[in-house]
Amino acid sequence: MKAKTFRYAVLFTLSIILTGIFSDVAAQPRMRFKANKVIRRTAIVLHAAHKQLRLNKHFTGNFARAVAHQRFARRQYMRGNFRSAIHHSRRARMLARMVIQDNKGMPPKEAEFTGDENAGGKDNPTDAELDADLMKDNPNLKFSDEELMDAALDDVDVDEMVNDK
């Protein structure tokens, strides 16, 4: 009787483990799609912020921070860390929106978070944690809006890399 109970316990444990593994694998394509969408929408907002910054030249460092977070989100996307890519791209969009407002512009409709993107939760990282992640990845990073003002922002979107809309 003891051996039978042990066998059932082992089978039950294995089924729980395998269910967790397969549910995570099934969620990957969905997370990839969501991350792609978030990064693409943020790229639109970043381009609008870039345009507004060139017009009014009100430098706060937020534009450079936004570009750095978006580039980090792109790298995370390429590594398959889709959840991290979403969080960093959302942070980039919030910063880009602040740049637009600081430079007396109207944010585009893509600046608003959709219901899908605005998923709150206790396990979401704070802005400080996201900033720390960014600095841990690149400790020599400097945030200068002036340097980026005339730069081409061709590395903030995922469309050039992968077209999986």
Locations of the language-model features?
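Bacterial N-terminal signal peptides
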Residues: 11-20
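Bacterial N-terminal signal peptides that target proteins for export
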Residues: 2-12
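Well-ordered, non-transmembrane segments within structured domains
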Residues: 2-3, 20, 85
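Short, intrinsically disordered, low-complexity terminal segments
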Residues: 6, 23-24
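Long, charged/polar, soluble alpha-helical segments
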Residues: 25-165
